[in-house]
Structure formats: structure tokens, C-alpha cells
Amino acid sequence: RTQAELEAAWDKLGGVVRRPVIFQTYCSTNTPVPEVAMFIRLAKKYPKSFGYVKEEAAGDMANQRMVKECAAKPVMKRIFSGWGGWQWLYQLRHCGSEGLVTERVAYAPLLMRIWREYEKGDRDGELTEAFAMYRLLVDQRNFPGGGLRDYSLYFLEKEGLFRNRVSRRYLNASETEGGSFGSGRKWKLDKVQISDTQRKELDLLYAEILKALEK
């Protein structure tokens, strides 16, 4: 794919959709990251549907792009963070992020606290602490997977939302802070295995953090 091909395809999409569309950027060697200028052009042409972006370009590129996208308001409507919230606090404070689109529903109580503290202007001085607790939960890199899902599924199972910890796992996957990425489209279903010691630590962390949120 080229930038021109991406824009042509999305131009056709803009002609048929009737509701807001959130574009998600990415880090891929197979497809170029859509140019910010492209998003702006499309948002001008289709103001009722386009102008929403979940920014997940690689590393600091996501931050730089977010600043440019937010500078293009009101043509651009809303710019959201991604990558499991790893850079969310920085992006809230300095890049114009207006929310988080993520699979990390297992940590909803913490994510809610982070957002509410930010909305209040951090007048209680608890925003950094709340984000630090979130990072503690999601940064157990030596636990199974350590990517986007993996041991996080244990919390959903613990709360009775999931009946098991079976998840899609990419073959030849590499783990990064943004999740698990594989080559090609090959994947398998696998159950996340957690040792008794790891389970005890996750239970302890989760209980302590929920207790802190009740204060």
C-alpha cells in the first residue's frame, strides 16, 4: 500500500458512511503510517464522519503526530491514545489526548480514576499516583506473555467476566510495551498459564490497588 492508495480507499469510505469513523494508526513495515495531512484533508471533505484518530504510531512518533492532529482542530474532532495506555499520562498532559481506546477493560477502575483526576485538573494531586498504580499492574513483563492480553485475562476471569484465559496468540510473536506482534497472519489459540506464585502476586496487587481507590 501507498499513501495515495490509503487515501483513495478512505475517500470511497467517506462517501458511504453516515456515522463517525475512528482511524487507528499503527506500526507496520508492510503499510505506511497514514500522513497527518491526509487525515486533515479527509476530515475537511467529510466533516460529519472523519476527524477522529486513535494514535498508535511507533514510540514518540505517536506523540508528535498527536500534537499536529490536535493543532488542526476544529477540522480534527477527537484524538485518542492507544498502546494500552502506556503513554497516556504524558499524552494527556502534553499532547492533547482526549481519551483512551484500549482492550485493557480489566483495569477499568484505575482507568476511570486516571480520567477523573485529569478532568478535575489534578487538584487533589493524585493523577501521577493513579497512573503509577496502573503501570504497576500492566508492567509485569516476566509474567506469561506480558503483552496486551495474556495475564490480564486472569483479572477478567477472577471477576467472573470470562470463563477461561484462552486468547489468540500470533506465531513468531515479539512482545513490546504496546502488545504482542507477529509476522504475517498466522496465529493460534492458547490458554494463558499462570503459576501459583504469580497468581498470588497478581491477587495481592489487584486487592491493594482496589483498596487504595476506595479512599
Identify the role of each PLM range:
Residues F23-S28, S49, S167-Y170:
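Glycine-rich phosphate-binding "P-loop"
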Residues K12-V17, C27-G146:
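Catalytic alpha/beta core domains of metabolic enzymes, predominantly
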Residues R1-V33, E175, D190:
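Active-site beta->alpha loop and helix N-cap motifs at the rims of alpha/beta catalytic domains
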Residues Y90-K215:
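Structured C-terminal cap/extension of enzyme domains
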